[in-house]
Each structure stands twice: as C-alpha cells, then as structure tokens.
A protein has these predicted regions:
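Short, acidic/polar
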Residues: 46-58, 212-218, 330-337
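Hydrophobic faces of well-ordered beta-strands that scaffold small-molecule active sites
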Residues: 31-35, 67-69, 99-101, 129-133, ...
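Flexible, glycine-rich active-site loops centered on histidine and acidic residues
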Residues: 28-45, 107-175, 227
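Conserved, mostly hydrophobic/aromatic
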Residues: 31, 59, 63, 71, ...
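A conserved active-site cap/scaffold subdomain adjacent to cofactor or substrate pockets
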Residues: 213-236, 241-242
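Active-site mouth loops of central-metabolism enzymes
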Residues: 35-50, 104-112, 201-211, 319-328
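N-terminal beta1-alpha1-beta2 module of alpha/beta enzyme domains
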Residues: 1-99
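An alpha-helical appendage that flanks or caps ligand/catalytic pockets
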Residues: 2-5, 12, 20-24, 153-189, ...
C-alpha cells in the first residue's frame, strides 16, 4: 500500500468512527441533539443563541453524541438561518461533542461555498464536524427564490444528485483532468497537504444525507452514506424510508453497513400536565407556520387560551401525538418504543419551548432517565 493509499484508508476509518456513536447508560442507541435555535415571544435571537451554547455544553457533559443545527429562513421563531456561523460559535464553547448541520440546504448554496465553510469548521474543531445536507429549501417558495436568485423555485432541488457530486469532489479535491473546476480548490482542504511546505491533508467531514421521503433515502443508500430521517415531521414515512435506505445500501469506503438516525420531537418535564402545556405551544407554533403566519414561539399560557376551530384543534391533537412528551419515564418509554419500531441506529432529539431553560431541563431529564453519566 502506497503512502497516499494508507493515508486515505486512515481517513476513511476516522470518518467511520465519526459516523457511528456509542450508546451510554441504559439508552438503546446513541442520543443526539437537533437545535433550531428557538426564539420565544418576548425574547431575542441573542437569548436563543445563548441557550444553544448552554445546551451544547450541558448535552456534551451528559454524553450526547452530536449536536446539529438546522437551516431555516424567514421564520421569526427560528434563529438558525446560518448553521455554519452558529457551529463555529459552538465549537469555541465545547470540546468533544460532534457538531454539524441538520442540515445545510444544498440547493440554497454554491457547493464550493459549503466546502469552504465546512473545511473551515473542520480546521476549527478537527474530527468533530458533520456535514448534513438536505434538498428542501428550508423556507417558503418566495424566500427560496430570493436565496437562489432565481424565479425557478425547483431549480437546485431537481439536480440535487449533481450538486452533491460536485460538493464531494470539492471536499475531496479530486476533479478529473480536463474538468473546468480542476484547478479550483476548497480552502481549507486536501490540496494544502500536497502544496509546497504542506504538512498533511485536512480531514474531510463525513457527509450525511437528510430527508423526509424515499428520494434521499435511496440516494444515501446507493452512495453508501449515512442517512438522517426527519421523523419529527414525516412520521408516516419513517419505516418505509429506512427500509428503502437499507435495501439500496451499497458499502462505501466510509461506511460498510447502513447507518440511519431519526429526528424525533421530545419534551420531558417533571409533571405530565406541564409537558402537555408545552407540547400544545409547540403544536400551535407549527399550526401558525402551516397557515402561513409564522411568528415567535408562543408562551404555553397563550397556547392554552388560543381560540381555535375544530379543524385547528384536530391539527393540534395530531401534531402533539407525534411529540414524545411527558414525565422522564414516559419519554424514555416512548423513545424506546420508537427505536424498536424503526430500528434506528441513533435518536436525534429536537425540543422546542418558549423558554430556553425548559429546553435545557428537558434534555437533562432525558439524560437522567437513561442514566447517562455526568462528565467532570
């Protein structure tokens, strides 16, 4: 084996280690965090970002495997429009937990820009970065058009496989001779290791595909990539999508067997009634978003007093049923049942609440329910 081949094999092993986590305590699989940086009514984006810092540090101390930040735009109650910027900030406040995008919406960005951003993150936090990619816009159609500077709303989503291939080539710096991008390099990146005076190639963050249907599941399987499914807003498609991913999976240099995590909405409180109050606020927030009236995340008292029609109350009940909520024991039981039904390799918990301390407390209670160790 040549030196280059040995280096690549080492790189692949490190990538695989970053993908597969370790379960702690009594948890059946690794537990992770998905953060949308929720902004409550009467609070600011600064407040929400401070909560994200605290939450990343607390979940790191309790053995959560990774902490991902989503990309959403033009939503007053969500301050995660720029995952790379937020991740850089979190990297400065954490030491071990993996940090990643859940996800970056590839059609909204030039592949070279994403490669440069995540190469920079990898340089800031070596061997801790995940690059999760989605094909949805993460917003409404008009905002998507503004982001892409195009009147064609589907532009970018339709050629997602081609965009993905281009991004991976930038990450690996392996455009073939004769390609118009052959002399273009994502910096920081592998080319620095082969440049005069170069010491070693930069580590390439593992690429994940995100999805809520069969398209990304099949593509992830065919490419041998890890897959993250959005169970929290597409629960009816979870099992079919995971089955499709496993059926179409082809081993790759970074992943010998399929690895799938699912995102799940969960909220634990000391008392069951309070969990129901918080979950109703979560459902009301989603109802307003679906009705084209997104706003700051409502206070539970506002949600309790909201006058809704029969169809709106039906939506509230349906959405709440897909949130694993209750006392810590009830949430643990619900998460265990979800794992048994789906066979997911990892559970990524997302928790939304009006107050940041409610979110932080929920993760602490879940960690306690699973007897996760406390670092330090």
């Amino acid at each position: 084996m040549s030196a280059d081949e040995a280096a690549q094999a080492h790189e692949n092993r490190e990538a695989a280690d970053g993908i597969r986590g370790t379960a702690h305590g009594t948890a059946p699989v690794p537990l992770s965090v998905l953060d949308l940086v929720t902004v409550g009514a009467g609070r600011t984006a600064t407040d929400a970002l401070r909560t994200s810092v605290e939450l990343s540090r607390r979940t790191e101390a309790r053995g959560f495997h990774r902490y991902w930040v989503a990309e959403h735009h033009s939503m007053p109650g969500v301050a995660s429009s720029s995952p790379a910027v937020i991740l850089a900030h979190l990297a400065a406040h954490t030491e071990r937990i993996r940090l990643g995008s859940g996800g970056v919406m590839l059609p909204n960005h030039a592949p070279l820009v994403i490669a440069e951003q995540f190469g920079t993150l990898e340089a800031l936090a070596p061997h801790r970065i995940d690059l999760g990619l989605g094909r949805a816009p993460g917003t409404d159609g008009a905002t998507a058009a503004a982001l892409r500077r195009s009147d064609t709303l589907n532009e970018g989503a339709d050629d997602f496989p081609e965009q993905l291939a281009e991004l991976i080539r930038f990450l690996d710096d392996d455009f073939p001779d004769g390609h118009p991008y052959r002399r273009i390099h994502a910096i920081p990146g592998p080319v620095q290791g082969s440049a005069p005076g170069g010491v070693q190639s930069a580590h390439r963050p593992p690429v994940w595909l995100l999805g809520s249907s069969g398209f990304s599941a099949q593509l992830a399987g065919m490419l041998g990539l890890p897959f993250a499914f959005a169970h929290h807003f597409s629960a009816q498609n979870t099992v079919p999508a995971l089955d499709l991913y496993r059926q179409t999976f082809r081993p790759s240099p970074v992943l010998a067997e399929p690895y799938a995590l699912i995102g799940v909405s969960a909220l634990a409180t000391d008392e069951e009634r309070e969990a129901r109050r918080q979950t109703r606020a979560m459902a009301l927030n989603m109802l307003r978003l679906r009705m084209g009236r997104p706003g700051l995340f409502p206070d539970p008292a506002e949600a309790e007093q909201a006058e809704l029609g029969a169809m709106e109350e039906e939506f509230i009940a349906s959405w709440s049923a897909n949130v694993v909520h209750g006392t810590p024991d009830e949430v643990r039981s619900g998460l265990n049942d979800l794992h048994k039904r789906t066979g997911a390799d990892e559970l990524m918990i997302t928790t939304h609440a009006h107050r940041g301390e409610v979110r932080v407390r929920s993760y602490e209670l879940i960690a306690d329910a699973y007897e996760l160790p406390t670092a330090g």
